[in-house]
Structures are given as structure tokens and as C-alpha cells.
């Protein structure tokens, strides 16, 4: 095959011309003198049509029938070079169609296990390496790519520097009960839960920094919102106030949604996502409500017919049903700010005049998707941080470098983190986080 290949996504530029496409057979149908071949090449899907009389006319009866028979016998996922004339076709769901003039098989496909019918979740996850080829799974990956692209673009435009934090560490950033431990030349080491502590060092050097990479949490959870390995974007910045941080987070999330609308509209269409809702999340301001006001709201509405959550008192943490109700009540992504210090991380700065609350925020996505961002102002006073660590019985020697940051020109600073898979799930409108990453790692699943 010596002809120049084009991508399916570019066929609109070749109407009336003969082109060659390298693709896989996603499906086929037809009978008698006509065969329909649905093609995919990673950029998009496209339909080719083969007419038996045309093949006989071009190649002669014997060769024409042989070539047409090859097309009729194609198995799903056979890889091919297919040549034909691009035609506009309003009747086609793709908008264009390929009048096939030739087809060459590159790689035969055996009987493909994932056929166009319903399959159980365990079967699909066992065959994840093949399930990724389906239209909806490809669409989710395209949305993931658009979100990652928009992340780098946003932080570059806002003066942040990419700062890589280590994957291996000897201490924990968050809950030490959720660590994966490994041997590091005879010493215990842990897979990173977050790059935050190291990013704070970066912010003291470079002002505004972010990292993006895999993190690991040994959560024995089987919910639709948890993975043991996922990708996290953490950002850290100096000299920003809490309100300015919330403004930045809101702008970031809106930039991610806009990035998907711009770069992957066809993926949203395949997934039948409510695009008007996504546009509204961009145009309308996010809501901001204090933790205590949110608790009061929950208490006032817990007897409503359409509520389904347990009673909470001030000082209790939210569960998923509470987060869902809060975000749906306001109808847009909602910041819940100033949680109790009792169940938040040691490094969070107290609310001035109210040491029982901390300057933090969780961003709750509507439509039942829950928390997608967590952030806070960091305690920048050395003595206050030491006192908090003593109160919690923490070994300060494990955090000597972190404490040093408060001894040499400490400044007000804060940061936030977003689990990319949760954002992908929200924007894509899918039901389970396992579809938001190519090969999910969950409780009881570490292959393929």
C-alpha cells in the first residue's frame, strides 16, 4: 500500500475525491449486491458502501466477485486499507459516506469477543483492552484527552510552572491508613497520595506551580467514585487569598468544560451528554455555601419526600447522598467552605476567629457526581503548625523539610487538587469512574 492515507476525521475535506484510509472494521451489514462497512481509525467513525456491480465493472467478473466477497466476509476488528470516493450523504449519521472501490486486508481478526450486544460489567472489564475500541469508550478517552490538554493550557495561561513531585515518599500527605507501602532498599516507602507537600516547596521557589501524575490510595471501597490508582492535578500558589483561590478553581473547571466542548463535541454527542447543562455550568456562577449553612439546609429539608439521606449534626462529615443533595439543590457546581478542623488535614489554616473551622473548600458537582476538587489555605505559621502536629501526636521529624518552609520567609499560600477521572466522569456524564481511565485499578482488580 503506497497511497497516502487520510484520517476519517478529515474526510469532509475530500468530497468527490478518491482517498485511502487505514482503519478497523467496527461493524458490517448488507445483503445481495450491497455491503455496508462501518470503519474506525481512532479519529472518528465512518461508513463505507460497496456495490457488487461496480466491482465487476472495474475488475472484471471473476476478480470483482472475489473482491466483493472479501468485503462481505470481513470480521469485526479486521484491519484494512480501504479506498473509495468520499460523498456527502445527509441520510448517513456520519454526514459522509465512502463509495468503496478497493479494500486490502492488513490483519485478520479472529471471532471478536465483544460483539454489538449487551455484555456484563465483569466480562467487559476482563476484556478492557478490547472494550476500549467501542464507540462510547473511545469517546470517554477523547474527553479525558481534552481535559488534560485544557489543564496544561489553563495553568500555562495563568502563570503556573509544571513542577514534578515524587511518586515515592517516606511520609504521608493525608490519611496514613490509605497508603501503599513498598520496600525502598530495606526501608519502608510509600506510593504518593498527593504531591502537595512538595508543591508547597515549589510555590516558595516559583510562586505558582502545578503537577499532574498518578497517585495511589489503598481505599477498600467499591463505590462508583473510587479508584486505587488515579491521576491527580495539584496546584499550589503563594500570595493568593482564600476567595481568590476559589475564583481560580472556578475558572479552571469552566476552562475544562469549555475545552471539551471545543475539542471533543463529537464525543459528547456519542455519549448523549446534555450539552446545554454543560454550557450553563460555564455561564452561571458557581455557588458558595459554608459547611454550617449546608448542614442547616440539610436539616431543614431532611423530611422532604424527595430526600434520601441520614440526619447530620454540625460537626458531622457529609456522605455521598448529602453531597448529591447540596449540589442538586443549587443546580450548579457548589463550593462548600470552612469545614470542621476535626476531620480535615493537619496543614489547613484555621478560619480567623474560629479555630474549629478551617479555610478550605470542596467543589461538589451537580447531577450526583459529588466532590471533584478539594483545596485549602495552608497553615503558614511555624509555631501554629507545630502545635497542631503535637495535638495530633504526629512525628515532626518525618516532616522536617515541610516545617522548614515556615522558617525561611513563609507567606500566605494555598492549593487544590482535582482527580481527573472524577472530572472526566462528570463531563462525560458516565455512571462509573472505572470508564474514565484506560485501565482502572480498583479493589480486587489489577488486570488487565
Curated annotation (Swiss-Prot):
Broad class of enzyme this protein falls into: ligase
Highest taxon in the source lineage: Bacteria
InterPro entries: Aa-tRNA-synt_II (IPR004364), aa-tRNA-synth_II (IPR006195), aa-tRNA-synth_II/BPL/LPL (IPR045864), Asn-tRNA-ligase (IPR004522), Asp/Asn-tRNA-synth_IIb (IPR002312), NA-bd_OB-fold (IPR012340), NA-bd_OB_tRNA (IPR004365)
Presence of the UniProt keyword Cytoplasm in the record: yes
This protein's UniProt keywords: Aminoacyl-tRNA synthetase, ATP-binding, Cytoplasm, Ligase, Nucleotide-binding, Protein biosynthesis
One Gene Ontology cellular component annotation held by this UniProt entry: cytoplasm
SUPFAM superfamilies, A to Z: Class II aaRS and biotin synthetases, Nucleic acid-binding proteins
Record-linked Pfam families: tRNA-synt_2 (PF00152), tRNA_anti-codon (PF01336)
Reaction it catalyzes: tRNA(Asn) + L-asparagine + ATP = L-asparaginyl-tRNA(Asn) + AMP + diphosphate + H(+)
Known EC number: 6.1.1.22
Annotated localization: Cytoplasm
PROSITE patterns: AA_TRNA_LIGASE_II (PS50862)
GO terms assigned for molecular function: asparagine-tRNA ligase activity; ATP binding; catalytic activity, acting on a protein; nucleic acid binding; transferase activity
Family: Belongs to the class-II aminoacyl-tRNA synthetase family.
Subunit structure: Homodimer.
Annotated protein name in UniProt: Asparagine--tRNA ligase
Organism lineage string: Bacteria, Bacillati, Bacillota, Bacilli, Lactobacillales
Amino acid at each position: 500500500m503506497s497511497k497516502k492515507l487520510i484520517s476519517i476525521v478529515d474526510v469532509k475535506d475530500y468530497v468527490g475525491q478518491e482517498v485511502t484510509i487505514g482503519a478497523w472494521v467496527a461493524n458490517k451489514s448488507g445483503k445481495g449486491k450491497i455491503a455496508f462497512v462501518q470503519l474506525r481509525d481512532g479519529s472518528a467513525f465512518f461508513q463505507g458502501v460497496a456495490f457488487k456491480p461496480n466491482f465487476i465493472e472495474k475488475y472484471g467478473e471473476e476478480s470483482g466477485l472475489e473482491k466483493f466477497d472479501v468485503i462481505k466476509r470481513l470480521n469485526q476488528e479486521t484491519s484494512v486499507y480501504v479506498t473509495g470516493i468520499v460523498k456527502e450523504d445527509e441520510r448517513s449519521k456520519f454526514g459522509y459516506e465512502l463509495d468503496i472501490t478497493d479494500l486490502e486486508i492488513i490483519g485478520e481478526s479472529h471471532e471478536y469477543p465483544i460483539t454489538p450486544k449487551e455484555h456484563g460489567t465483569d466480562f467487559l472489564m476482563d476484556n478492557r483492552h478490547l472494550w476500549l475500541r467501542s464507540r462510547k469508550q473511545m469517546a470517554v478517552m477523547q474527553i479525558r484527552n481534552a481535559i488534560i490538554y485544557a489543564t496544561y493550557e489553563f495553568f500555562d495561561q495563568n502563570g503556573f510552572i509544571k513542577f514534578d513531585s515524587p511518586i515515592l515518599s517516606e511520609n504521608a500527605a493525608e490519611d496514613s491508613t490509605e497508603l501503599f507501602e513498598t520496600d525502598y532498599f530495606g526501608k519502608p516507602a510509600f506510593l504518593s497520595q498527593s504531591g502537595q507537600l512538595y508543591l508547597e516547596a515549589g510555590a516558595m521557589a516559583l510562586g505558582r506551580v502545578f503537577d499532574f501524575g498518578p497517585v495511589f490510595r489503598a481505599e477498600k471501597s467499591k463505590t462508583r467514585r473510587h479508584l486505587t490508582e488515579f491521576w491527580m492535578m495539584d496546584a499550589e500558589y503563594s500570595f493568593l487569598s482564600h476567595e481568590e483561590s476559589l475564583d481560580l478553581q472556578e475558572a479552571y473547571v469552566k476552562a475544562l468544560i469549555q475545552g471539551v466542548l471545543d475539542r471533543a463535541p463529537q464525543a459528547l454527542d456519542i455519549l448523549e451528554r446534555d450539552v446545554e447543562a454543560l454550557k450553563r455550568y460555564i455561564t452561571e456562577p458557581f455557588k458558595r455555601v459554608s459547611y454550617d449553612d449546608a448542614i442547616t439546609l440539610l436539616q431543614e429539608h431532611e423530611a422532604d419526600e424527595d430526600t434520601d439521606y441520614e440526619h447530620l449534626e454540625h460537626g458531622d462529615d457529609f456522605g455521598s447522598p448529602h453531597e448529591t443533595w447540596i449540589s442538586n439543590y443549587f443546580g450548579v457546581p457548589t463550593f462548600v467552605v470552612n469545614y470542621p478542623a476535626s476531620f480535615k488535614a493537619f496543614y489547613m489554616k484555621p478560619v480567623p476567629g474560629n479555630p474549629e473551622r478551617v479555610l478550605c473548600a470542596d467543589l461538589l458537582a451537580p447531577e450526583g457526581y459529588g466532590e471533584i476538587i478539594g483545596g485549602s489555605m495552608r497553615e503558614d505559621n511555624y509555631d501554629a503548625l507545630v502545635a497542631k502536629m503535637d495535638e495530633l501526636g504526629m512525628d515532626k521529624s518525618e516532616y522536617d523539610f515541610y516545617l522548614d518552609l515556615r522558617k525561611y520567609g513563609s507567606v500566605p499560600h494555598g492549593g487544590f487538587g482535582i482527580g481527573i477521572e472524577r472530572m472526566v466522569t462528570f463531563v462525560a456524564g458516565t455512571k462509573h469512574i472505572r470508564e474514565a481511565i484506560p485501565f482502572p485499578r480498583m479493589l480486587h482488580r489489577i488486570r488487565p
